[in-house]
Amino acid sequence: MHLIFFFSYFLRRYLLLLCAILILRAPLAHSLIPPLTCVNTGTVESDVTGIRFDRCLDTDSLAKISLSTVMSKARVYTDVNVIRPKDYWDYESLNVQWGEQDDYEVVRKVGRGKYSEVFEGINMNNNEKCIIKILKPVKKKKIRREIKILQNLCGGPNIVKLLDVVRDQHSKTPSLIFEYVNSTDFKVLYPTLTDYDIRYYIYELLKALDFCHSQGIMHRDVKPHNVMIDHELRKLRLIDWGLAEFYHPGKEYNVRVASRYFKGPELLVDLQDYDYSLDMWSLGCMFAGMIFRKEPFFYGHDNQDQLVKIAKVLGTDELNAYLNKYQLELDTQLEALVGRHSRKPWSKFINADNRHLVSPEAIDYLDKLLRYDHQDRLTAKEAMAHPYFAQVRAAESSRMRTQ
């Protein structure tokens, strides 16, 4: 009994000492960080996050808590994946049901990306057109994630429909089979769009975004290339879910997502606990390009220059307020590149060529999307209720009444 007592006593003292050493050694991003306490039961509680741990943490874990002094969480759909069963979001456990590759035949190449080549194809069973996305060699985990997300979103408004998943018997190269959309290149289409067309298609895109967000999924690559529009049928589809990810509150994500011109400030300043609002920034960049006829709207030559281009429009005062709120710091080189800029009024972008597309409500809507602080941006549902879309909502209500 005495041996057990002394062993227990010294173990508790050792754990307390170890916690103290680890806290002192943990790299601090900022000077004002509340201390961690380790009680003598072996439980560690962070005053920063309120998280309790059943043991003393290693250096990396403590460093992460220290760096995340202001935890950011999504304003909406925060706990979708907390409430859902694990098999909804656990894509690593997905057992892929492979179809028959011989059921499909390639007709012509229609595009290529970093992770895939895209072809128009034919379903040999029913002679219907389809899109065949042949994936380049990537981690199986990434392929499973895209498939799982597409399966979860199947049937959602304006989400491209996954029809089948096949793979080559010899090379094992996987291909995703999608519904066919007769899309016009956005560089050709956008300059022809009327004011109402832009309102209509942005509203349709918001339907897709609100749906995927409501299902606990961030797209993370919203851009014109990934928004297919069949203008004749007035049909829109949000495609390419290869970078999409399940949202878990407090989780730190890779900031190397989205295409440069559409990257949110959170990615450019290395804020990792971002959320669905990233998609709303990308949408805002798209929208600005459409109404001002300036594509891309923020034209950075690299990631650092991208932040510079944003700062020259939104100003550096609000950028600094954003950094201070989340206790982030730019490295010295980037800080020097960004410099100091006053906010540029949206009216400075209006000219004779785009005046007919830029209304007061369009400017107000844009201003509520392109915010440094991701928590200040409109959510997709809030955006759909904006006065900018009043005409579109009225037309949709009228159409539904006559059906």
UniProtKB/Swiss-Prot annotation:
One of its GO terms (biological process) is regulation of circadian rhythm. Keywords: ATP-binding, Glycoprotein, Kinase, Nucleotide-binding, Nucleus, Serine/threonine-protein kinase, Signal, Transferase. It catalyses: L-seryl-[protein] + ATP = O-phospho-L-seryl-[protein] + ADP + H(+); L-threonyl-[protein] + ATP = O-phospho-L-threonyl-[protein] + ADP + H(+). The active site is at D221. One of its GO terms (molecular function) is protein serine kinase activity. Seems to be present in all plant organs. But seems to be more expressed than CKA1. Disruption phenotype: No visible phenotype under normal growth conditions, but the triple mutant cka1, cka2 and cka3 show altered circadian rhythms and delayed flowering under long day conditions. Glycans are attached at N182. Its main location: nucleus. Its EC number is 2.7.11.1. InterPro entries: CK2_alpha, Kinase-like_dom_sf, Prot_kinase_dom, Protein_kinase_ATP_BS, Ser/Thr_kinase_AS. GO terms for cellular component: nucleolus; nucleus. It is found in: Nucleus; Nucleus, Nucleolus. Residues 104-389 form the Protein kinase domain. Residues 1-31 form the signal peptide. ATP binds at V110, G111, R112, G113, K114, Y115, S116, E117, V118, K133. Casein kinases are operationally defined by their preferential utilization of acidic proteins such as caseins as substrates. The alpha chain contains the catalytic site. The tetrameric holoenzyme CK2, composed of two alpha and two beta subunits, phosphorylates the transcription factor PIF1 after an exposure to light, resulting in a proteasome-dependent degradation of PIF1 and promotion of photomorphogenesis. CK2 phosphorylates translation initiation factors. May participate in the regulation of the initiation of translation. Belongs to the protein kinase superfamily. Ser/Thr protein kinase family. CK2 subfamily. Heterotetramer of two catalytic alpha subunits and two regulatory beta subunits. This is Casein kinase II subunit alpha-2. The lineage of its organism: Eukaryota, Viridiplantae, Streptophyta, Embryophyta, Tracheophyta.
